[in-house]
Amino acid sequence: MSYKAKTVVSARRDQKKGRVGLTEEQKQEIREAFDLFDTDGSGTIDAKELKVAMRALGFEPKKEEIKKMISEIDKDGSGTIDFEEFLTMMTAKMGERDSREEILKAFRLFDDDNSGTITIKDLRRVAKELGENLTEEELQEMIAEADRNDDNEIDEDEFIRIMKKTSLF
């Protein structure tokens, strides 16, 4: 367990921030989704087509999210997105999804009883396995820092929030 925990954390530290690299297979999937929804062959897709294309790639974007994405990506103000813009956007989205999955892997290393929360007992065990000699007060402070709903435990959302806040992921 301690080896796995160290591996997950060090792998994330070593990974470059920002744009993640996509495999050729992922790029091909993105190209196929784009082409499928570029029904008129214009080389661009509009907001409605974007939503359908993203769903085909496994995302569930909300209307506001689509509008925001288009305004950030559509630099020429045409209201449409070309393939390069779509690829840039989907690369970022896939990076966010990968980051979340990595954080949840780390969460599961702490939550070895699969309760869905990290307790002070879980934190104490991991600290000991990693050779960290933390006091009860320090452990409690760590829980308190992440705990948003005052239940003295850290759930998945709280863990994701604190990991992103501390830039460990």
From Swiss-Prot:
GO terms for molecular function: calcium ion binding; dynein heavy chain binding. Ca(2+) 3 binds at residues 111, 113, 115, 117, 122. One of its GO terms (cellular component) is inner dynein arm. Ca(2+) 2 binds at residues 74, 76, 78, 80, 85. It comes from the Eukaryota. Keywords: Calcium, Cell cycle, Cell division, Metal-binding, Mitosis, Repeat. Gene3D superfamilies: EF-hand (1.10.238.10). Residues 1-24 are annotated as: Disordered. Ca(2+) 4 binds at residues 147, 149, 151, 153, 158. Ca(2+) 1 binds at residues 38, 40, 42, 44, 49. One of its GO terms (biological process) is cell division. Residues 25-60, 61-96, 98-133, 134-169 form the EF-hand domain. Binds four moles of calcium per mole of protein. This calcium-binding protein is found in the basal body complexes (the functional homolog of the centrosome in animal cell). In mitotic cells it is specifically associated with the poles of the mitotic spindles at the sites of the duplicated basal body complexes. Belongs to the centrin family. This is Caltractin. It comes from Chlamydomonas reinhardtii. The lineage of its organism: Eukaryota, Viridiplantae, Chlorophyta, core chlorophytes, Chlorophyceae.
